[in-house]
Amino acid sequence: MATAKYGLEPIGPQKPDALVKFDVDPSNTAIYRGDVVELDADKGVAQAPATNVDNIGVVVGFYDADGLPALYYPAGNAAGYTAIVNIDPHQLYKIHYYHASTALTAADVGSCADWVVGTGNTTTGQSGAYVTSLGTGAAGLYVLGLYEQQG
């Protein structure tokens, strides 16, 4: 599997005061809902690379240059887009885990991981970020539990 289903998806309610609007850096690559972003000097937010440590939050929505809701930010210098970013450091997220031979177990709780920046879905606007390996050192994500998906 090359990409995930949803990137980082919030679990539970999101605090309204933690949803902040940021301009999107127009020289950036495409950004999708569920992508981790960083501040890019005075240009706005940009998609954060996998091992980045100065992340501002996770994108939960977009507005285009006309102020209309957009599924994602298209690459190629599209100007005037705004990203809605969840900046709450206490927000819990679920993310797709994929490994060819190792499944997650309760013993993995407490591990850390960096996400892989996958290809987002232009039809749904969902991120392609996922996790493929766990560790015990410093990383951008921590496993706090296993999410039981129904259905």
Listing of model-derived features with the role each one plays in the protein:
Residues 1-151:
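Surface-exposed, low-hydrophobicity beta-strand/loop segments enriched in small/polar/acidic residues
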